[in-house]
Amino acid sequence: MTSLKRSQTERPVTADRASVVSTDGAPKVHTDDFYMRRFRSQNGSLGSSVMAAVGPPRSEGPHHITSTPGVPKMGVRARIADWPPRKENVKESSRSSQEIETSSCLESLSSKGSPVSQGSSVSLNSNDSAMLKSIQNTLKNKTGPAESMDSRFLMPEAYPSSPRKALRRIRQRSNSDITISELDVDSFDECISPTYKSGPSLHREYGSTSSIDKQGTSGDSFFDLLKGYKDDRSDRGPTPTKLSDFLITGGGKGSGFSLDVIDGPISQRENLRLFKEREKPLKRRSKSETGDSSIFRKLRNAKGEELGKSSDLEDNRSEDSVRPWTCPKCFAHYDVQSILFDLNEAIMNRHNVIKRRNTTTGASAAAVASLVSGPLSHSASFSSPMGSTEDLNSKGSLGMDQGDDKSNELVMSCPYFRNEIGGEGERKISLSKSNSGSFSGCESTSFESALSSHCTNAGVAVLEVPKESLMLHLDRVKRYTVEHVDLGAYYYRKFFYQKEHWNYFGADENLGPVAVSIRREKPEDMKENGSPYNYRIIFRTSELMTLRGSVLEDAIPSTAKHSTARGLPLKEVLEHVIPELNVQCLRLAFNTPKVTEQLMKLDEQGLNYQQKVGIMYCKAGQSTEEEMYNNESAGPAFEEFLQLLGERVRLKGFEKYRAQLDTKTDSTGTHSLYTTYKDYEIMFHVSTMLPYTPNNKQQLLRKRHIGNDIVTIVFQEPGAQPFSPKNIRSHFQHVFVIVRAHNPCTESVCYSVAVTRSRDVPSFGPPIPKGVTFPKSNVFRDFLLAKVINAENAAHKSEKFRAMATRTRQEYLKDLAEKNVTNTPIDPSGKFPFISLASKKKEKSKPYPGAELSSMGAIVWAVRAKDYNKAMEFDCLLGISSEFIVLIEQETKSVAFNCSCRDVIGWTSSDTSLKIFYERGECVSVESFISGEDIKEIVRRLQFVSKGCESVEMTLRRNGLGQLGFHVNYEGIVADVEPYGYAWQAGLRQGSRLVEICKVAVATLSHEQMIDLLRTSVTVKVVIIPPHDDCTPRRSCSETYRMPVMEYQMNEGISYEFKFPFRNNNKWQRNASKGAHSPQVPSQLQSPMTSRLNAGKGDGKMPPPERAANIPRSISSDGRPLERRLSPGSDIYVTVSSMALARSQCRNSPSNLSSSSETGSGGGTYRQKSMPEGFGVSRRSPASIDRQNTQSDISGSGKSTPSWQRSEDSLADQMEPTCHLPAVSKVLPAFRESPSGRLMRQDPVVHLSPNKQGHSDSHYSSHSSSNTLSSNASSAHSDEKWYDGDRTESDLNSYNYLQGTSADSGIDTASYGPSHGSTASLGASTSSPRSGPGKEKVAPLWHSSSEVLSLADRTLETEGHGMDRKAESSLSLDIHSKSQGGSSPLSRENSTFSINDAASHTSTMSSRHSASPVVFSSARSSPKEELHPTASSQLAPSFSSSSSSSSGPRTFYPRQGATSKYLIGWKKPEGTINSVGFMDTRKRHQSDGNEIAHTRLRASTRDLQASPKPTSKSTIEEDLKKLIDLESPTPESQKNFKFHALSSPQSPFPTTPTSRRALHRTLSDESIYSSQREHFFTSRASLLDQALPNDVLFSSTYPSLPKSLPLRRPSYTLGMKSLHGEFSASDSSLTDIQETRRQPIPDPGLMPLPDAASDLDWSNLVDAAKAYEVQRASFFAASDENHRPLSAASNSDQLEEQALVQMKSYSSKDPSPTLASKVDQLEGMLKMLREDLKKEKEDKAQLQAEVEHLREDNLRLQEESQNASDKLKKFTEWVFNTIDMS
């Protein structure tokens, strides 16, 4: 036989392809016989031994092996074909050192004859032939037919010298050219066999010219196969390793081999197995041949080999499933990517060619798919530029990706791409409102996560946050978060650079080049925790993931002593943290600046703050790449867009980031578009600004730049065809952001956005809201720039760019490890004298148990988390650092959940599972499946890093009335507990936070649902988070400091501007849904400063809210009145919230949702109070506080103005607003969903609309009866119904607040309703804003009742101020009720004001916050309402009975008793309007008299309730007398009382109150405001509150004692207060005051009450009250007829006269004028303060401008100085030179 002729370096595997001659020496040429194919491996390497001896290599034609190729080589084919140097050029190179070393090995396979091209032949001996056959069989069996599919065509190219390369015809470059039908059945079966699948797939990776996939797997293991056949030449051990490495490199670089993505993981495992089989023996041999004379080294090696053997067995057992590497628990990770660091994966990937693949990616992949999916019509539009369609052949035939089937008018679904068309949002795995039933169905609802201070999952990077940076993290409310940035890359720069540390480099046998940086430090904050020293470590491999973090010295077992100045041996530290690392390979690096700079460059390789973005211009009717590139110039719509996006810059001489554009010769155009965003510089490659080539269809000058941009913006004019990436041919364009203009070049121009990204690019934010358009604004610009930046950052995580970055990183590391190291090992004490062998080895001390739990970085546990949204579980890593809790999904290697540790409020743990509650009760669940101790460790860690605590589960029993005995507000916080009741005995305490009710998470429930669940469940099992030691509820940092997230109500068709505020860059405007009356009301964001100011008012003289002793029921747990909460979706909500915010001091609490935070108080303040400001420990009445703070209340939280302007005005002065988007409140869903933007019933908010009031009243009253205490229910429950009809905006506003109220667990919510109602009523009477013809927006009833009162008092401002108007209406309502009130009890009820209502009203008023409640008697309350009140009053008694024993403070919270069911403001059925107690201002603290009186009244009420008597009237009278006595010191209070009494004079309290349940005890309950009220409001409210017995906490059922019920003063005032939300009394009072100032209407004055000593005739009281009401009504009517609701003019005169007479007779003394004067004074002061603030701001702006000018001048002067000095220097030199010359 003739021998094979081949180069020494050509692998023998290709022998089967060489020509074979017969035994007689004559060469035989075989054509490509179909029947012979089965004997060869498909498309590949070795055939059978028979074929080796019989057949020639397969060829496309009958060309002889020595002939030239039959197909001409042109273009890329020619380059590829000639790539391996030809024989002539390589003859010497084949003798390179590496190849020479392996020559003998190859000679054993083939004779040393000349290459085939020389034509000489040498015969093979029998041994050679047998060995070849054996090799062939082995290869066939081991690598499988699949592995060799491409090898016979591709393998020759993998070698530097291929003797037959030049002579061999170009084969198909991929098996995709070979259809499966060309293979016979046998070979096909082999291809589809499992064995085949484990190797490379049948088809090649799609690729274009430079991305041909060559499979070199067989080359990787070739020398392993040869080892079995080389009997001699044992001295050549190292050679195969080097050659193998060489071949791997060649195959990688030359061929870009890759495996199909589909089979990638299997191939990785197979490669890992082959690598280990080959590498392990080499490792052992190299160890034994190192020649190291150290005994310790040898001993260590022996031990290592034993360990290696055992690990080899493990590897063999798990070769199909390589377990992820787990870092020791003692290691605290610095950032997220460190947690994802996987040492096993690094080992595997180092030898896996998959990272070297360079395949068709980006838009080209889509183009490829479009070709494969249809018949291969090589149309010009889709063919590749060189006409090589095979470049576009993809894996299409085998499981081609079909896209995501998401399309719209902007973008089409496309293979290999994923579309984002709006509404996608971020993944949510926690159990929260967003994924509960009420929200899940609303696709139109979208949360603008970018506005939330909650970091997005993709935006989480650094986990170890220094204490000094914590406050910075609180201020995360930046509009958009930059995502997918490895900010941990600064770890070396921050903690190592220019500090004492050690760098070690080396080449590990498994990991390749590695670099380790280690530093020992003594952190200041660690002293408290025990371990004084900490080791910071960075471990770098060729993989992009880097291990960064720290380990406490006490957590490291060591032979040395801990906590000494010398420290532990670094070797022991590294061996403990990274046991897989061979530390002996490490050598100390040079301590030079070059090394540190190179390390920083290596670490920060992935950080790039300069980005280039392409912009393609698509005109109407266009869709293809050529059409877009051939648009020579920009149209007006495009120019308008470009002007918004960036700055047009002249390229010539441009010195900033130029993005490969020519800035010298204008060869790439004269101008371009440039901009900056945050820290990023962005240069746009605008297609119309790049050079246009008239005769070049492809416009290569343009495509050269845009085609190489990763992110491209496609701007579409109206009428453009939907965009599809398949029309683009580019390997780099991975993300397209499609922007379509609507109504371009008009004032209403707006843009819609869609995104399509390559499938391996992770999703990125900010999310696109569904069905919205963005108006032209800076907000849209920021949104788009953030989207573009995040798109590029995310694209760098795709496989293509990661592979490129990995290669770069490997080269950096290699250079460092080879050229920048000393000979110093990591353990310099390496060799000891032999004598040391005899000594006993020193044992390592055990680490301090649990030491790592005090680390600042993230400690990690492997757990299984529950995805509540998808109802599935997934494996993940739980990381808990000092700042963050993160769950990282192992499969996707992405963060699935994150929250701040300061947001954790508690947890429920068992042996194997843990449920963590955070923020407002949302929760995540994890299970431990590795160690039973994991959960205990996690709990200890949570105790260390958070302020939460273990939850408590308890079963609650009902009392005889079916009541549970506690009040819960809408946040799930227990506001009051009946002393010694069943709930109290079970351990429930005020401030406890319910997180689960009957296994249902409270976070998923609305307040109404919560109450229903408590009321209807047979067995009530609750899980609570116990309060702090001072009884304040546990709150998350978000609730306290963070602006609430506003939930945008997106109805399709509404322009984006109405959904997001773009009017100001700083503010987000929200408008209600389409139906909303004032869609454009700008919600003003309150600047933090403003909020602080507002908050400050309350704070100034009060203890911190946390200290507040009581949580008003009506107030949200954060202290904001519940009713204040509006649905964020509604206009009113926005307005109200803004107003409320303006008033509320810190309404940030989630409860504040409603507060859009326009008003500074709510939104602006980051500090949330657990209680209303008014409720400080001192429990001062809010009113007083308001007053006290009035002067300081610059923000004018008291503004009652409904319009945003008001808040804006006050806020304007303040600093830039923070996002006030109200947090999405539980109330929101209903309101938001309702098309009109009305509050939905969902929140038991009382709707004010007068029409409904009556009905809802009754309904409500029943609700109210269901006090939370009674556990029955939330008054709110029926709230909505009250106003289902039309609600005035004010109603809505109040409703929102009411909703908050309802949160009170139904306590007094009804009252709230009325409060709102009253306000609404005002509006209604005025004309219920909705019902009224104008449906003018009633000022949001946000104003505290006092405000409303004050409004009423004042003269209601103008129609413009809806609030004022509402207030007026309220007044009018009152008047009406007066006029009508004379008649029956019903009328009295009408007056709705029945004391009960009044009381509640007052409460509300007192809370002041509920301005709306103030006048809320519903002007139109239907007769039914009136009737219902009676029922409610009945309820009231029970309430009172339940709370009869409660002391003043307890009374502070009105019970939800039915009594207050009708809010004071409810109208009579006839439509009479009862004025609400305008005592909002009552000062609770005022001489404490009010409180005492109130308490007593309540007590008496309770007593009455306890012993119901048929003659409730007398009882009530007595109670009233008592109240009057108590309040006598405050004439105003007396007046208030009188007023209330008047409001419902005829009917016994029970009747009237019945209509409403007492409001929650809010500040008003405290009577806090009554005395403080500047106006009659004060006294009335407080008296009323006191008078109302509704204070009873627990009546859940309507008490059957209708008459005896002494109405507790309803929380009506509370309701008002609630409206304000957290507003402290000061807020409301301030607001009222301000309004009062605004409205200079003279106050008719408080109705004088008789002295305490004087006898009171009940009938007289009633008459007086009526008369007074009439008088006031007429008074207000006169001041503003427009606002006067329904007062009967005919009767007004008479009534007025009567009232005057009665007032004279009854008033023992005139109202004190001092109050009014004080108010005026305060108002004047406030005005001055505002002016001063405005001036200060102007001055500040001027100063800033001056400073800027000075800086510019300074720079200019410096430059001039420098120039002058340079000139002087030159002159001096010249002078000296001339002197020297002379």
Curated annotation (Swiss-Prot):
Asymmetric dimethylarginine PTM sites in chain numbering: R1580
Polar residues: compositionally biased ranges: 1080-1093, 1186-1205, 1378-1410
Residue ranges of the region described as Disordered: 1-28, 47-125, 140-171, 277-297, 1069-1128, 1144-1213, 1247-1285, 1307-1342, 1358-1454, 1625-1647
Alphabetized UniProt keyword annotations: Coiled coil, Cytoplasm, Cytoskeleton, GTPase activation, Methylation, Phosphoprotein, Synapse, Synaptosome, Ubl conjugation
UniProt modified residues of type Phosphothreonine: T1309, T1530
A single cellular component GO annotation: actin cytoskeleton
Locations listed in the record: Cytoplasm, Cytoskeleton; Postsynaptic density; Synapse, Synaptosome
Biased composition range(s): Low complexity: 95-125, 1149-1159, 1261-1276, 1315-1328, 1432-1447
UniProt-recorded name of the protein: Signal-induced proliferation-associated 1-like protein 1
Organism: Mus musculus (Mouse)
